[in-house]
């Protein structure tokens, strides 16, 4: 699937939003529950030839299967109005800059229209759905930039963890170029590299592929 474009195949009628919420409440794994929610939201937007991308801290949580947790689910959307309409039908209420669903324990923040870069976007399959997640390379640079700007040790730690876990999959040429543009220094791999399966066991059920 091409990032930012919907499939042109025939779609069966989607389940009603309330029915989806009812099913999500039954999912005991918090990360999987979030990903199923995002998958449903992605599916509804795809039907209208629009897209959402998972970015920020929730993308880090997803790639690390919960090693780093976050509060808000940060997404970008090519159609904010439609996205907000779907959230409303799912029982989310707007509170300032975020949409909150207390029953699901979720808060969604629509941060922009589209990510700055989409060429390294990954597709993660969960249940019957597919979620677009910002690429590892772009996420590492994003965390490094945040660490530099805010002098944040946590963001630097996240960048290091992502780099160590996915070092064999990273497009180093692309990463170096992006880091240079943002004027950030790349982390050095630790002597003991953490393998992706060790670090992200949930991804055994949420298969990541190049978009």
Model features per residue range: what roles?
Residues 2-211:
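Compositionally biased terminal segments of proteins
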């Amino acid at each position: 699937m091409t990032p930012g474009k919907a499939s042109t195949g025939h779609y069966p009628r989607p389940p009603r939003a309330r029915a989806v919420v009812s099913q999500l409440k039954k999912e005991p794994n918090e990360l999987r529950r979030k990903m199923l929610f995002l998958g449903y939201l992605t599916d509804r937007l795809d039907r209208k030839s629009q897209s959402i991308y998972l970015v920020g801290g929730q993308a880090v949580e997803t790639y690390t299967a919960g090693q780093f947790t976050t509060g808000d689910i940060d997404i970008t959307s090519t159609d904010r109005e439609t996205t907000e309409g779907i959230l409303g039908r799912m029982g989310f209420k707007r509170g300032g800059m975020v949409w909150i669903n207390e029953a699901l324990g979720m808060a969604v923040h629509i941060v922009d229209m589209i990510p700055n870069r989409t060429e390294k976007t990954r597709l993660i399959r969960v249940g019957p759905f597919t979620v677009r997640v910002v690429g590892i390379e772009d996420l590492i640079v994003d965390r490094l930039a945040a660490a530099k700007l805010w002098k944040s040790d946590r963001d630097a730690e996240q960048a290091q963890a992502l780099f160590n876990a996915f070092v064999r999959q990273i497009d180093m040429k692309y990463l170096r170029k992006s880091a240079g543009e943002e004027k950030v220094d790349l982390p050095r791999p630790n002597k003991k590299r953490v393998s992706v399966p060790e670090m992200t066991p949930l991804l055994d059920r949420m298969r990541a592929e190049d978009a």
